Amino acid sequence: MAVLEQTAILTDAIRPVPASELEARLEKFRRLMDGMHPGWEMAAVNHKIAMYYFTGTMQEGVLLIRPQDAIFWVRRNYERAVNESHFSDIRPMHSFREAAAYYG
């Protein structure tokens, strides 16, 4: 029983990553991409730890980053992603084809 109580305490202490921090991380990534790969058009992030770093949640999906925007396409647990994250653009998708179709 004590383990469950400790788990609840730790869970209650977790706070979402602030939106300003998420935006700063994206801007740093874009600056690095501009320096290393001038003219880059899009980067796809699907590794869960990297997704957490950029979005504040690790739901199944893909984060697509372009110089002008970034969209986190969530395949499973969209509601959880929205509840956990302060990322500015989270969209649901049923398959990765939906995200691909958005970009033409």
Where are these regions (language model features)?
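Terminal domain-start leader segments
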Residues: 1-72
